[in-house]
From Swiss-Prot:
Pfam families: Acyl-CoA_dh_2, Acyl-CoA_dh_N. This is Indole-3-acetate monooxygenase. It comes from the Bacteria. The lineage of its organism: Bacteria, Pseudomonadati, Pseudomonadota, Gammaproteobacteria, Moraxellales. GO terms for molecular function: acyl-CoA dehydrogenase activity; flavin adenine dinucleotide binding; monooxygenase activity. Belongs to the HpaH/HsaA monooxygenase family. The gene is iacA.
Length: 389
């Protein structure tokens, strides 16, 4: 059901890395509750994500990166998410070059001077007032939902630059070493608990202007990746977490069904007509949603590689495919849990984890009902809300 990534892809980066073995380790540690109980992904796993290229995949080659396509990156996140949704979610922020590419080129050279494996975490909303000084901006405030912050090298926070109590220009993101921010461990959720999406607190940190940028501002870098719609990519890397988890749910049920009989003496689950029907239907819906998700990505990437700009309709299709896939994946995992019976209701049962994780994906603002409304606006030739495209 999954697109298999070859171990050979990582041989040039680190001969000791075996993606299959890493995923098995992640799965075992996640099922034992390690990441959920501590509310973050352990640092040794972050280091192994570096080794398989998660954080250099999208960095330009001139800075030591790999310049993968968006699809290649999403397929890797899908594979990791199949092992554990929280690890996949944290790894998805390897897409950070899409944001950081808006920094000045000289700043990027400084950022990657010791190598491209830089782990970024962000707390964007709400943008906090930041006083402009001759040296830069003074940043203070609290930001929520900073996924992966416990393992980050640098963090970015949303600011509204002020001078004489008046806002100056558009909101920006200020980037600083992670040790300049305090982490308050507030993340206690029903799903994706291991992402460690805690609060960032910053107290009067001076950030030079060259380390700030307008989020969503087009990058001045020439590589094709920086022509790809960054907000769409930010949505896709989260959606594909749900795709990976749903794939895991389907595979887990395929293994369970042939040997599981009812405690009341009924036939094995796999021999029940209703199970056969429901599983086939769920699998078809999943495969269709996943295929459309990747198809819309390929269409836009091919346009960019050919030197053309993607149309509003093509970009809107990517956003709509994300919302659709996220919801289908949540539906599929719930169906697998229902078919698995009473054993699937326990907290540490894999099916409970699958359901909780995919439902959290659907709660993200990028996958909200507004996406459907905006997609409808584009379909009718009308202007969508700012930030949709």
């Amino acid at each position: 059901m999954m697109n298999k990534l070859s171990k050979m892809e990582f041989a040039a980066q680190d001969k000791a890395v075996d993606l299959d073995a890493l995923c098995q380790e992640i799965r075992e540690r996640a099922c034992a509750g390690e990441f959920d109980n501590q509310a973050y992904v352990s640092q040794d796993i972050i280091e192994k994500l570096k080794k398989i290229g998660v954080y250099r995949a999208l960095v330009p080659k001139r800075f030591g990166g790999e310049e993968w396509s968006p699809r290649q990156f999403c397929e890797l996140i899908e594979t990791l998410s199949k092992a554990d949704g929280s690890v996949g979610w944290v790894a998805s922020f390897g897409m950070s070059p899409a944001y950081l590419g808006s920094l000045p080129e000289e700043t990027l050279k400084e950022l990657y001077q010791n190598g491209p494996d830089v782990v970024f975490a962000g707390g964007i909303f709400p943008p906090q007032p930041a006083e402009i000084t001759d040296e830069g901006v003074v940043v203070r405030g609290r930001w929520k939902f900073s996924s992966g912050c416990m393992g980050a090298d640098i963090v970015g926070v949303g600011i509204s630059p002020l001078k004489n109590n008046e806002m100056q220009g558009l909101p920006r993101m200020a980037v600083m070493p992670a040790n300049k921010a305090k982490i308050e461990m507030t993340w206690d959720t029903v799903g994706l608990k291991g992402t460690g999406s805690h609060d960032l607190v910053v107290e009067d940190v001076l950030v030079e202007k060259k380390w700030t940028f307008v989020r969503g501002e087009p990058s001045k870098l020439s590589e094709p990746f920086f022509k790809y719609p960054s907000l769409s990519l930010a949505t896709q890397v989260l959606t594909v977490v749900g795709i990976g988890v749903a794939a895991a749910a389907l595979e887990e049920f395929e293994k369970l069904a042939p040997g599981k009989a009812s405690i009341t003496g009924g036939s094995e689950i796999a021999n029940r007509p209703v199970t056969q029907y429901e599983f086939a239907q769920a699998d078809a819906e999943f495969q269709a949603a996943k295929s459309w998700f990747y198809q819309t990505m390929d269409i836009v990437w091919n346009e960019i590689i050919a030197g053309r700009e993607a149309t509003a309709e093509q970009i809107s299709d990517m956003r709509l495919a994300c919302t659709h896939a996220a919801r289908v994946c949540a539906k599929v995992t719930r169906k697998m849990q229902m078919l698995a019976g009473m054993t699937a209701i326990y907290t540490n049962n894999p099916f409970s984890r699958f359901v909780n994780d995919t439902n959290v994906v659907t709660q993200h603002a990028f996958m909200g009902d507004a996406t459907l409304q905006n997609a409808g606006l584009v379909s009718f030739g009308l202007k969508p809300a700012p930030g949709y495209l």
